[in-house]
Amino acid sequence: MNGRTREYLKGRFGDHYRRASLSPPPAANEREWGYITWGDGGTTMVRHHSYLDVTGGGDLGGFLAGERPRHVYFSAGRYDDPGASSMGQKGWRGSDLVFDLDADHLPGIDPSETSYAAMLEACKGALSRLLDLLVEDFGFEPLAVVFSGGRGYHVHVRRDDVLELDRTARREIVEYVLGEGLDFDDIVSTQAVAGSAGRSSPAQKRTLPDGGWAGRVRTRLTTLFDEVLTMEEAAALDRLREFDGIGEGKAKAALTAARNNREELTKGNVDVHPAVYSIARELFETVVEAESAPIDEPVTTDINRLIRLPGSLHGGTGLEVQHLDRDAIDAFDPLSDAVPETFVGNEIAIYTQEPTTVELRGESFRLSEGVSSVPEYVGVFAMARGYASKAGE
């Protein structure tokens, strides 16, 4: 990025902060603050500052309007002395539990081949799965959901009962959300019952409990058999034979078991027939792959992590880091809703070295090689991404 481009973006970021209304996170005085400047010698991180250090006793917006940083962060950690120059001197008191979703970590997404819009849409799907796991399985409410301004989302849990979790405990939560280390037999509840049922006495009844990963598999299994029980027999058998190791005989046995034991199946009993157990085991793999959330593990386990400030601008896109209400997530379009109003309504001249396409505010802009006049928000995005530089007016 050349000097003219840097100075232009720095100035316009400052204009944004003069207009913006920013609210610091809870316990702002207990957190470390940091920011990245628009320096010409690479990335320069300024950190180990307290809230008082950065604001000088004033407000956060005034500091940002004056400093005009490229990126702004605060710590998940809370400290006795957040401005101390080393982590050991800060006196750790606890940390928010933070989850990060980024398109780079989504399975099947290649950032070099996937459009920015498609990556963000895929990330929103992963966010929905993450929130379901956090709320339904852990009971983590309230949650703070934030669009990162880049290619993903952050979720903050600030309840008192998570603040003092150490890295090991946070890693266990990560593994659960990722579905790592899960085995089907671990989620099945085993109960001794009277009789032998063809096995050693007493027999064992294996059941998928309601809730958690077991509950998800149970729901999928019940849905499957509800589906096949409404089909013609030939179609139902074909559907069941789609599962590995289920041939004609086992498919018929599973279908018969489902007809005769529908109530038990609904209760999660996977021992109504060995074929049903085999199908449930395979569904487990499918459910974990489909309903886990590909979070970035180091973000959650790092109790000292710096995370982006809502209301600030992302220096790699020019988009706003935005707090989202849970009921607004489905309708949220980051390529429209996160475009700062500061950059709307003006045209600027930019120079593009290679042709590229930018999609913002519901429109697609084809930038040809050379100098062109574009809406400022398009130019800011292209310059921040490194696609273009500022041309002379």
Swiss-Prot record:
Please name the GO terms of the biological process aspect recorded for this protein, alphabetically.
DNA replication, synthesis of primer
Named from the GO MF annotations, one term is: DNA-directed RNA polymerase activity
- What sections of the protein cross the membrane? none
- On the tree of life, the source organism's domain of life is Archaea
Entry cofactors:
Mg(2+); Mn(2+)
Q: Which UniProt keywords apply?
A: DNA replication, DNA-directed RNA polymerase, Magnesium, Manganese, Metal-binding, Nucleotidyltransferase, Primosome, Transcription, Transferase
Kindly list the GO CC terms recorded for this protein.
DNA-directed RNA polymerase complex; primosome complex
- The active site consists of 100, 102, 296
Q: Name the EC number(s).
A: 2.7.7.-
Q: List the InterPro entries hit by this protein, alphabetically.
A: DNA_primase_S, DNA_primase_ssu_euk/arc, DNA_primase_ssu_PriS
The record describes the protein's role as:
Catalytic subunit of DNA primase, an RNA polymerase that catalyzes the synthesis of short RNA molecules used as primers for DNA polymerase during DNA replication. The small subunit contains the primase catalytic core and has DNA synthesis activity on its own. Binding to the large subunit stabilizes and modulates the activity, increasing the rate of DNA synthesis while decreasing the length of the DNA fragments, and conferring RNA synthesis capability. The DNA polymerase activity may enable DNA primase to also catalyze primer extension after primer synthesis. May also play a role in DNA repair.
Recorded family membership? Belongs to the eukaryotic-type primase small subunit family.
This protein's assembly is summarised as:
Heterodimer of a small subunit (PriS) and a large subunit (PriL).
Instruction: Name it.
Output: DNA primase small subunit PriS
Question: What is the protein's species of origin?
Answer: Natronomonas pharaonis (strain ATCC 35678 / DSM 2160 / CIP 103997 / JCM 8858 / NBRC 14720 / NCIMB 2260 / Gabara) (Halobacterium pharaonis)
Q: What is the lineage of its organism?
A: Archaea, Methanobacteriati, Methanobacteriota, Stenosarchaea group, Halobacteria
